[in-house]
Amino acid sequence: MLLTGCTDGRPKAADPAISLERRMREAAVRDSARLLERYDSTAAAHPALAGRLAPLRAAVAAHVSALSPAVPGAPSPSPSASPSGGTGAAAPAASGEPVPAKPEEALTALADAERSLSEARTIDLAGAPAELARMLASVAACGAVHVYLLTSTPGAKP
């Protein structure tokens, strides 16, 4: 006697934890990509800040890659992308907000964006699956360090 298994032809329901994680990762990637664009806009508007911003920008690009859901063949952002030189005038940031004309104010605006995103990620920890929560915590901590670096005077003693 031969027994065969049958299904009713309907697709299996998606694992809600997996879809929650995927949605959270996709939102985190979008947020980091917007922050990455702000770094690019700020460096383009203030070329003298580009060197100071480069390592922070590279870290944000790494966050985009690390948070991205595994999609075969998907390109990742370049951590070494260099924006074109600007005139120092206010340039529109990717978020639609202009980059402030003064370098100090541009750094403050970038620090505010980092702070807001770091705080949002900290809040998201409560609902995230364990592995993603650990990653969000790490990225949020990195954002807090970026806030410090963006608002401190280079070379000054603490």
Predicted feature locations:
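All-alpha RGS (Regulator of G-protein Signaling) helical domain and cognate RGS-like helical scaffolds
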Residues: L2-P158
